[in-house]
Amino acid sequence: MSTYVPIQTITLGSNSATVDFTGIPQTFTDFVLVGNFTTNQSAPFRLLVGNNTIDTAANYSMTQMAGTGSVTESTRSSNANFIASGYINAAGRSIWQMHFMNYANTTTNKTVLIRYSTDVSASQSANARVGLWRSTSAINCIRLETNASPQVFESGSTFTLYGIGSGSPKAFGGDRVVTDGTYWYHVFTSSGRFEPVTNLSC
């Protein structure tokens, strides 16, 4: 069973053309970035990643599939300086999810799955993209940036990073069972049964 562990949330207190996450822990198998945001201008936005510094070289590629229920399309870009992460419509709120797989691995190139939708009635669509960073370096920093001035992510937009750890708890029981990526915590709000499923040491 995989577990989502909140790492960091950024809520914009003012308009910004970039959103940066740095010092991403290397203790998870994957991580997921969820964005819930608005913009002042309908335009694409970009994803860049790196190890200690953001890579702005032509080391990215992207494949997209999209559909509205009546129309479908696909596009591809390669040898780009960023991953084109989708089109933001200024008329509504956008919900984005980016899933970075094996991000701490140092032997393979890095893949990210991007899914998003908009709540604009005139252009409702579902979109999926696959991005590739051609580097075997681990990812410990990421950047979202708007396409060009004067486009910005608007104040109040939120971006949350979750780590995904593999594994499962070594016991059953508790009203809530949570993990910080290293340890499991069984919370009892009343009396209950704690039942280990393996030998435990203390």
Q: Where does each model-flagged region fall?
A:
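Extended Gly/Ser/Thr-rich low-complexity repeat segments
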Residues: V197-C202
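Surface-exposed molecular-recognition determinants
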Residues: M1-R193
